[in-house]
Design a protein with these regions (language model features):
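Glycine-rich phosphate/diphosphate-binding loop of Rossmann-like nucleotide-binding domains
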Residues: 55, 62-80, 138, 146-184
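N-terminal ligand-binding/catalytic initiation module
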Residues: 1-136
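Acidic, glycine-rich active-site loops and adjacent beta-strand->loop/helix elements
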Residues: 51, 90-93, 142, 172-177
C-alpha cells in the first residue's frame, strides 16, 4: 500500500482511520459514487485469471499463472499509473468465477480478465458485464483486437490505401480472432 495522503502525525493517522474515517464512510453510504472520491477504488483494477489459457503455456492453473498476472500489474502501473491486485481463482467453473468476481465489485474500479480459456471466457465476460456496475475487459480478446486494428490502420496508411477497399483476413477463430472479426 502506498499512501496518497500525509501520515506523519497522530492527527493524520486519526483522519486516515478512527475517528476521522467515519466522515467518508457516511458520505459513501449516502452516495456510493463518492467511493471514487474518498477511496482508491477509481484507480484500482483486479487482474483476474484461473490460469486456463496462459500464453505459450496453456492450462497451467491459477497458482502457476500468478507471475503472469503480477507482470500484467507491473505494466498497468508503469504505463498508466493504475494500481492492480492480481486475483488468481482456483476454479474452472465459470459460474463460480463469475460469483466470486461479482463479490469483489465494491473494492475495484475495473476488472481485467486474463488468460481464461475459450469458450468460457466469452460467457464469463458477457455475464460479468450484465451484472457489474464497473468496466469489465477481457484482455486476450479485446486487447489483441485493438492492437491488431491499430496495426492494420497504420499499415494501410503507410502504403497509401483506403481501409474500405482492402480485403482483410482473420486467420483463426480463437478468443482473439473472434474479437478481431467482431471489431471490424
Amino acid at each position: 500500500v502506498i499512501t496518497t495522503k500525509p501520515c506523519a502525525t497522530s492527527r493524520d493517522l486519526a483522519l486516515a482511520y478512527t475517528p476521522g474515517v467515519a466522515e467518508p464512510c457516511i458520505e459513501i453510504k449516502k452516495n456510493p459514487d463518492d467511493a471514487y472520491k474518498y477511496t482508491a477504488k477509481g484507480n484500482l483494477v483486479a487482474v483476474v485469471s484461473n490460469g486456463t489459457a496462459v500464453l505459450g503455456l496453456g492450462d497451467i492453473g491459477a497458482l502457476a499463472g500468478k507471475p503472469v498476472m503480477e507482470g500484467k500489474g507491473v505494466l498497468f502501473k508503469r504505463f498508466a499509473d493504475i494500481d492492480v491486485f492480481d486475483i488468481e481463482l482456483d476454479t474452472k467453473d465459470s459460474d463460480e468465477l463469475i460469483r466470486t468476481v461479482k463479490l469483489l465489485e465494491p473494492t475495484f474500479g475495473g476488472i481485467n480478465l486474463e488468460d481464461i480459456k475459450g469458450p468460457e471466457c466469452f460467457y464469463i465476460e458477457e455475464e460479468l458485464k450484465k451484472i457489474m456496475n464497473i468496466p469489465v475487459f477481457h484482455d486476450d480478446q479485446h486487447g489483441t483486437a485493438i492492437i491488431s486494428a491499430a496495426g492494420m490502420l497504420n499499415a494501410v496508411e503507410i502504403v497509401g490505401k483506403q481501409i474500405e477497399k482492402c480485403k482483410i483476413v482473420v486467420n483463426g477463430a480463437g478468443d482473439a480472432g473472434i474479437a478481431c472479426a467482431n471489431l471490424a
